[in-house]
């Protein structure tokens, strides 16, 4: 389950992103937090029509993971820090000492899996949150659901809690399915739904695809 197609694998796109414009004065901030590439993409849409906000590209950015950092760098943002473990709870502990005495802007989704905002608040970090995108469930007709339903013995990769929620909204998780999750929060959510999943040491899609291939080879 992912938000973009990945050849040659079958991708179930059950969510769609809605980007919201950023409307604020950027001058008070001297640090940015990004925990998702989608926050970057949303901000880029805003920058097309808001030249005054382009100074945000010169403000040091703290990125949760390498993919998010690369997206920032590819669009000429100034990356100051990349999370080592790429998990929300570990990431916030990594950046708290770096954000003391800074004025921080956290660009986020409407719903977030981690309690990053709460932890920053508890540690007295001066920050403002801006919701710049939302991950919404796509509407699927019954015929579309039947066409998309994974075959028995499929290996399913869940790249986010929102994708796991969307899958379980439309489909039953069969006993002979195998689940792989990116990140601890996604694995925990699946576990809460009674689904055990494999996790990789490195929370990346590439690592999950490699694990899926190795599991498929073992079955043969």
What residues fall within each predicted segment?
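Signature of uroporphyrinogen-III synthase
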Residues: 1-220
């Amino acid at each position: 389950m992912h938000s973009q197609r990945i050849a040659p694998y079958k991708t179930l796109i059950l969510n769609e992103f809605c980007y919201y414009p950023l409307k604020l004065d950027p001058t008070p901030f001297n640090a940015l937090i990004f925990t998702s590439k989608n926050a970057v993409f949303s901000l880029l849409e805003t920058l097309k029509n808001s030249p005054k906000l382009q100074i945000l590209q010169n403000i040091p950015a703290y990125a949760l993971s390498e993919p998010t950092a690369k997206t920032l760098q590819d669009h000429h943002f100034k990356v100051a820090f990349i999370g080592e473990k790429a998990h929300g709870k570990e990431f916030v502990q990594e950046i708290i000492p770096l954000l003391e005495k800074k004025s921080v802007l956290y660009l986020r989704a409407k719903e977030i899996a981690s309690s990053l905002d709460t932890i920053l608040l508890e540690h007295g970090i001066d920050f403002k949150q801006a919701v710049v995108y939302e991950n919404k469930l796509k509407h699927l007709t019954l015929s579309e659901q039947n066409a998309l339903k994974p075959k028995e013995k499929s290996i399913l990769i869940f790249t986010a809690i929102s994708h796991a929620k969307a899958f379980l909204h439309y489909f039953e998780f069969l006993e002979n399915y195998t689940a792989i999750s990116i990140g601890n929060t996604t694995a925990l959510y699946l576990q809460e739904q009674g689904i055990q999943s494999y996790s990789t040491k490195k929370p990346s899609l590439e690592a999950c695809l490699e694990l899926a291939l190795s599991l498929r080879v073992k079955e043969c």
